[in-house]
Amino acid sequence: MSPTAGLGLKSQHYAEALASDAEGLWFEVHPENYMAAGGPRLRWLEAIREKRSLSLHGVGLSLAADADPDPDHLAALKTLADRFEPFGVSEHLAWSTHRGAHQPDLLPFPRTRAALDRVARNIERMQDVLGRTILVENPSLYLPLTGHDLDETDFLIELTRRTGCGLLVDVNNVFVSASNLGYAAETYLDALPAEAIGEIHLAGHGPDEGGSALLIDTHGAPIAESVWALYQRLIERVGPRPTLIERDDDIPAFDVLMAERDRAHGMLTPSAASRL
C-alpha cells in the first residue's frame, strides 16, 4: 500500500475522526496522553483504531538527557504500543529532564561525540524495550549553540547507522531552524539519506511575539507555502512517505485540518490529486 497522509488526533475531533471515510487517513497521538488504565480517551482511541492505523509520537523520553530513559515511562509506552499496534513509534532528538526535574519543552544540546554515544545508547534501550525500531525527529532551533563536533545531519545519520533507527523529518522544523540559524533548508534536506526517512511531519510556524526576527515552531498556524514547497521537493527526491499534519495550538475545525491533510495526500498520490 502506498504511503498516505494523516492527522494528529485531538480530543475535540474524536467523533469526526471516527466518522470520517477519507481514503488512507491515519492518526498520530502523543502516547503520554493515553498512559492510563482506562477512561474515555482510551475508549475513543480503541474505537478509532478499529477503523484506522495509528502511530505514536512521544514527547517525554528525553533521549538526549544525561540519564537512561525513565523505565516506568518506557514500560507504559510498551503497554500502549502492544495494545494498539501502531505502524510507527517516534521520539524527538532533544532533552526535557535533568536530575529528576522535568522541563516543559524540548531542549537542544551540543552535538558532541559524547552526546552521540549517549543518545545512541538511549535509542537502543528504547528499541530493546519496545521490540521495534523507532524514528527520531529533527528539532527546531532558535539560537546557535557552541561546542558541536558534528553537523545536525551528520549526527542524525550516525544515529541511524549505529542503532538502526529511522528518521522522522519535520519539514517545518528544518525551515524554522534554517531561517533562524542562517543556512539553506534545501541543503539540509538533501543530506538526509532517503532510505532512512520513515515519516514526514508538516506544521505551521509564526513570528516571535517578542519582536525578534526569529521564527517560532508554534504548531498553531496553517502550513506555510514555503514549507509546502520544501515538502514537494523532498518527496520528489525520496519518494512518498507517510506524512502527518500537526496542529497542537489554536486548533481549528476538523474540516480545516482535513483540507491540509488532503493536500498532502494528493501530493503523495498524484492520481488522487485530480480528484481533489
Swiss-Prot record:
Per the database entry, which stretches of residues form a coiled coil? Answer: none
Q: Which Gene3D superfamilies match?
A: Divalent-metal-dependent TIM barrel enzymes
User: Which superkingdom, per the lineage?
Assistant: Bacteria
Q: Which organism is it from?
A: Caulobacter sp. (strain K31)
Family of the protein in this entry: Belongs to the UPF0276 family.
Protein name per Swiss-Prot or TrEMBL: UPF0276 protein Caul_0757
Q: Which InterPro entries does the entry mention?
A: MbnB/TglH/ChrH (IPR007801), Xyl_isomerase-like_sf (IPR036237)
Q: A single Pfam family, by name?
A: MbnB_TglH_ChrH
Q: Where is the signal peptide?
A: none
